[in-house]
Amino acid sequence: MNTPAVRFAARTVRVKAPGKINVSLDVGPRRPDGYHSVASVYLAVSLYEEVAATSTETPGITVSLSPDSTLDLDAVDIPLDASNLAYRAAAIMADVSEHATGVHLEITKRVPVAGGMGGGSADAAATLLACDALWNSGLSREELAHLAAELGADVPFSLLGGTAVGLGVGDQLSPALAKAKTHWVLVTADFGLSTPEVFRTLDRLREAEGVDADEPTGVDPNILAALRGGDADALSRILVNDLQRASIELAPSLRDTLGIGESHGAIAGIVSGSGPTVALLADDSVAAEALAEDLQHQGLSALAVHGPVPGARIISDTLL
């Protein structure tokens, strides 16, 4: 008697993970290993990447970009091979999962590419969580965070979300109990900046000025207090990003963007991380929406967001 073949049941787990802005970023000197120690306050904001992980009968990992992406996919260079962070995240999960199958990853891109907001890191965090669920790996959040750190400094934060202090190269995270909302307008650029190049430029500027940077040991407690209280006015006076001048050196138009934002009602502005995304702080949600609309009329790509928001989370789990 023939045993009926077992039909493969495909399943899709969809996860969303937030982009981030650096509310503060202190950068130490270049270390012998080429990296820089940092002290940063990360804020997860309401601009999300989505990854749909679908099990496949065919072994291996494939990646595609969703037509629902809000980015112009023709204008950005996103690898779909093993160099993609989401691909690498799936490969790491396959190595530690007893029931791994083939998987197809469809990524919905909304966070600017090479924009200083950790879009690729959000893809990786979403993929870790999606594959953990898809393959019933049963890893704890702590175990997932350990794998996330192997992929890049920003990946653990996208998994965690909320507000956090990052030390080391940004991967040593301590959650900050700052849940009050702040409102921002993100002005995105039609170009990217290479994070290593921005750090090299900062080193060059410091060397030319004879500046010996100190190793950062912590963040300004006033920033955390302002975030805990949702005090935009206090926060506006203490935003800091050591990389900002290097980003402006490479892309002088960022100085104009900051100026235009503040002239149209932003109470402060900062380049996020290595840029080129500019984060403009607004008094409240109404002011943020009005500012975004004004900047759009100026021909800029601007959208209102808020933070903090939760980290990567499953939004659907479907048998096909």
From Swiss-Prot:
Residues bound to ATP are: 112-122
Keyword Transcription applies: no
Q: Which GO terms describe its molecular function?
A: 4-(cytidine 5'-diphospho)-2-C-methyl-D-erythritol kinase activity; ATP binding
Q: What is its EC number?
A: 2.7.1.148
Which keywords does UniProt give here? ATP-binding, Isoprene biosynthesis, Kinase, Nucleotide-binding, Transferase
A biological process (GO) of this protein is: isopentenyl diphosphate biosynthetic process, methylerythritol 4-phosphate pathway
Q: Which residues form the active site?
A: 20, 154
Q: One Pfam family for this entry, by name?
A: GHMP_kinases_C
Q: Which reaction does it catalyse?
A: 4-CDP-2-C-methyl-D-erythritol + ATP = 4-CDP-2-C-methyl-D-erythritol 2-phosphate + ADP + H(+)
Pathway where it operates:
Isoprenoid biosynthesis; isopentenyl diphosphate biosynthesis via DXP pathway; isopentenyl diphosphate from 1-deoxy-D-xylulose 5-phosphate: step 3/6
Q: Does the keyword Manganese apply?
A: no
What sort of enzyme, by top EC class, is this?
transferase
**Family indicated by similarity:** Belongs to the GHMP kinase family. IspE subfamily.
Its biological function? Catalyzes the phosphorylation of the position 2 hydroxy group of 4-diphosphocytidyl-2C-methyl-D-erythritol.
**What is the name of this protein?**
4-diphosphocytidyl-2-C-methyl-D-erythritol kinase
Q: Which gene encodes it?
A: ispE
